[in-house]
Amino acid sequence: MSRPRRELPQPLKRLLKLRLLLKRKKPEFVRIDQWRYKRIEDSGWRNTRSIDNKIRRKWKGWPKPVEVGYRKPAAVRGLHPSGFVEVLVHNVEELAKLDPKTHAIRIGRTVGLRKRIEIVKRAREMGFYVLNPGKRVEEALKKELNTAQTGQ
């Protein structure tokens, strides 16, 4: 199934493109000495504290520190790249509260296959963009469609 596109106003389209450009320019923020010690390799950013710290003092050749200027435009912050607002769904009833023109759904990871198939079916009937239908769900829906066509 083709991906639905949200009809975005021109300023929002421009801001989504700008967000993509800013994302490409943003450096990877690393904790001090993460390249030196395996135990802190994947621990993420921690603010620097010492008076002699090169990152805090923004020395040339050292990793960039986290700063306000790397933030994305407020209007598109938290939006999916397609322009939809991403919403986590765990059952079919939650779809009734959402608008297919502005929301895209992501099915919760604890939802089993049977309920996931029901959610995807109902969401597509209502016109929602499902971000993570899953390969097994797609296969089950195709099989169901084929049996319905051959049965007629």
UniProtKB/Swiss-Prot annotation:
What biological process terms from GO does the record include?
A: translation
Question: Which superkingdom?
Answer: Archaea
Annotated Gene Ontology cellular components are: cytosolic large ribosomal subunit
Q: Which GO terms describe its molecular function?
A: structural constituent of ribosome
Instruction: List where the protein spans the membrane.
Output: none
Q: Which UniProt keywords apply?
A: Ribonucleoprotein, Ribosomal protein
Pfam families cross-referenced by the UniProt entry: Ribosomal_L32e (PF01655)
Q: Which SMART domains match?
A: Ribosomal_L32e (SM01393)
Family statement: Belongs to the eukaryotic ribosomal protein eL32 family.
By its UniProt entry, which PANTHER family does this protein fall under?
Answer: 60S RIBOSOMAL PROTEIN L32 AND DNA-DIRECTED RNA POLYMERASE II, SUBUNIT N, RIBOSOMAL PROTEIN L32
User: What name goes with this protein?
Assistant: Large ribosomal subunit protein eL32
State the organism named in the record.
Pyrobaculum aerophilum (strain ATCC 51768 / DSM 7523 / JCM 9630 / CIP 104966 / NBRC 100827 / IM2)
Q: Taxonomy-wise, where does this protein's organism fall, top ranks first? A: Archaea, Thermoproteota, Thermoprotei, Thermoproteales, Thermoproteaceae
